[in-house]
Design a protein with these regions (language model features):
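Charge-rich, intrinsically disordered N-terminal extensions
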Residues: 1-145
Length: 145
């Protein structure tokens, strides 16, 4: 991917230009970990989740998806990230996983995790659609070294 390099644990390092683009598109993106946290220890995993989502979001922006699609995917990713943090609290085995493995375990080809508290079937279907796109992206993109 142009403008990105592979960092530690397979994380992508986002260029300053891409960081600025994300800040314009989703000004509260860097606040997501704070909004997801149950306790202070959740900030680092939350930041890692946001870092894992950034290349996908940049891919959407580069493909010039509609504003409606982008906003829907942002909203869905926000819910998925919060659910990933919640699952880390609910399952000690999940809390031990590195974030990339947690994402790989909970974001599958057929959708994402069931969101709790329970949401409508329509909302869950939208989240599953976003998760399928994220899964395809994560499993078909090749990091530039």
């Amino acid at each position: 991917m142009a403008g990105q390099q592979c960092g530690g644990e397979g994380q992508m390092i986002v260029s300053p230009a891409d960081t600025a683009l994300l800040a314009r598109t989703c000004p509260d993106l860097e606040d997501w970990p704070l909004r997801w946290q149950y306790e202070a220890a959740d900030l680092a995993p939350g930041s890692a989740i946001v870092a894992a989502f950034k290349p996908f979001l940049l891919g959407l922006l580069r493909r010039k998806v509609s504003k409606t699609t982008l906003n829907r995917d942002l909203r869905n990713l926000w819910q998925v990230g919060g659910e990933l943090i919640r699952r880390r609290h609910a399952g000690p085995d999940l809390a031990q996983l590195p974030i990339d493995e947690l994402i790989a375990q909970l974001i599958e080809a057929n959708g994402g995790p069931l969101i709790w508290p329970r949401i409508s079937e329509t909302e869950q279907n939208a989240i599953d659609t976003t998760c399928r796109k994220l899964h395809r992206f994560l499993n078909h993109s090749t990091p530039t070294k």
